[in-house]
């Protein structure tokens, strides 16, 4: 069999033609051509597939507790009606009016 020899690749001369050097670009470094990103170690990483997260075992099959929970806020028991100064004053005035009316009706 005949031996096949590969020719060494020649540097791309088209890059130099695309960006002619001018006075503003003479001091700058030439930018690298975009390439495929490589990992730092230089070894190609394996493709990984992500699994869906599953619920903890047994937690979904457990039944809810049998205790009844109230639907809303529990109502507070009504305590004695707190009467302030003005409430007592109104009651006093009502009593006086009632007494006046009774005394007027009894006089007639």
Swiss-Prot record:
Biased composition regions of type Polar residues, renumbered to the chain: 58-70
Protein name as catalogued: Uncharacterized protein CXorf51A
Biased composition (Basic residues): 26-56, 73-92
Phylogenetic lineage: Eukaryota, Metazoa, Chordata, Craniata, Vertebrata
Protein's organism: Homo sapiens
Ranges of biased composition (kind: Basic and acidic residues): 93-108
Region (Disordered): 1-108
């Amino acid at each position: 069999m005949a031996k096949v020899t590969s020719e060494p690749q020649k540097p791309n001369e088209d890059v130099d033609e695309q960006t002619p050097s001018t006075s503003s670009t003479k001091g700058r470094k030439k930018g690298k051509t975009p390439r495929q990103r490589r990992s730092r170690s230089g070894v190609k990483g394996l493709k990984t597939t992500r699994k869906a997260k599953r619920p903890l075992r047994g937690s979904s099959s457990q039944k809810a507790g049998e205790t009844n929970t109230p639907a809303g806020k529990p109502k507070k028991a009504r305590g004695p009606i707190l009467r302030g100064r003005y409430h007592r004053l109104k009651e006093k005035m009502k009593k006086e009016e009632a007494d006046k009316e009774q005394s007027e009706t009894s006089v007639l």
